[in-house]
Amino acid sequence: MTGTLVVDASFVMVLLTSSSEATTTWANDVIHETDLVAPHLMPVEVTSALRNAERRELVTPEQAALTHEDLVDLDVELHPFEPFASRVWALRHAMSPYDAWYVALAERLDAPLATIDRRLARTADTRCEFTLPPE
């Protein structure tokens, strides 16, 4: 894949953590030769997911800290909310505002949205392409 790719927090978690080997390999293949973009919200969502994983003892504190460092170092262009506020509001009945921000960004940039959220990808109100892991 080449070009621009919108990445959501679920995708970034897979990219940065050692989930299943096949899914991690898929995520690394997807980002090859792409410019990653996301809403400004994404690093906060990933940080929250890391915190929850640590609290549930799915990762050690050391693993969480290293993953957080990788998140901070990840080369992702972050976009502010204001240019997408109207579309996020328009999608409010179909999905959460968090998901809507990713969708609105992908729609505006005419870029695929990489996610592991298959339910989001099935939402009828979206006008973007989704990149999902193999089943």
Spans of model-derived segments:
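Acidic, PIN/NYN-like endoribonuclease modules and their adjacent C-terminal/linker elements
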Residues: 1-4, 39, 91, 103-135
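Acidic active-site catalytic centers that drive phospho-/nucleotidyl reactions
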Residues: 8, 99, 117
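Residues that scaffold the ATP/ADP-binding catalytic core of kinase and kinase-like folds
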Residues: 14-16, 49, 123-124
